[in-house]
Regions:
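Ubiquitin-like/PB1-type beta-grasp interaction modules and other compact soluble beta-rich domains
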Residues: 1-206, 210, 218
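Short, intrinsically disordered, charge-balanced linker/junction segments flanking boundaries
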Residues: 217-223
């Protein structure tokens, strides 16, 4: 978005609480906010990551640095405490990839796992997640299973390969439902795929060797 300190308030809605600033919602168009759970599911809360890592402090305590990429995401808490379901902030290792109509787009989905102190510091592959790609129309475009034009499942290494039959720009995301079939146990990652038209090699015109004209030896006139 290229947001500045002055305009950030148009995109992040926050209020004060006894624990400091509390995020109420985020906005893409700068006009309306949204909850952490689009389906109003229980236990879905806001979190944030900086450069795809856990900053280790609350948002109001983090000091931004040049070129920091801040991601605010909604993530299911995994049920009542103690939490026996690990939920992961997830992201694409390369959030922008390119391919051609005749080629393949390969992405790697990673996530943050928790150490013994419940700090999200362990990078791990996210397997058995469904990667979805939808047509990119504008910066508000999202990819869901309903808008997807291409899907693929990640393997044990978090790798998924997609193919496209039309050139254009596509937005990527992924989801993975928990055993209850309702809650996604990863946050929704974001990426872009640029699909170029297939390059065709022109067929060379056949070369034709001209046929030499026959030579005629004149017959001498009789004397």
């Amino acid at each position: 978005k290229g947001a500045t300190t002055e305009t950030m308030k148009n995109y992040i809605m926050a209020s004060t609480s006894q624990y400091g600033l509390f995020v109420n919602g985020i906005s893409i168009d700068g006009n309306s906010d949204g909850s952490a759970s689009s389906d109003a599911l229980d236990g879905v809360n806001w979190g944030y990551a900086v450069n795809n890592t856990d900053p280790g402090v609350g948002m109001s305590s983090y000091s931004l640095k040049n070129n920091d990429a801040v991601t605010i995401y909604g993530l299911w808490g995994g049920g009542t405490w103690p939490n026996n379901v690990e939920t992961n902030y997830s992201y694409f290792e390369n959030d922008t990839v390119s391919t051609t109509v005749s080629g393949k787009a390969t992405v790697t989905l990673k996530g943050l796992g928790y150490d013994k102190n419940f700090v999200a510091s362990i990078v791990k592959p996210i397997s058995k997640a469904t990667v979805v790609a939808a047509k990119y129309e504008n910066e508000a475009s999202t990819a869901t299973k309903d808008t997807a034009v291409a899907t693929a499942q990640t393997d044990d290494n978090g790798v998924a390969t997609l193919s496209f039959d039309k050139a254009g720009t596509y937005v990527l995301s992924a989801y993975r439902l928990d055993s209850d079939g309702k809650h996604s146990n990863i946050s929704r990652p974001y990426g872009i795929v640029k699909v170029l038209a297939a390059v065709t090699t022109p067929t060379a015109a056949p070369t034709v060797t001209p046929t030499a004209a026959p030579t005629v030896t004149p017959t001498a006139a009789p004397t």
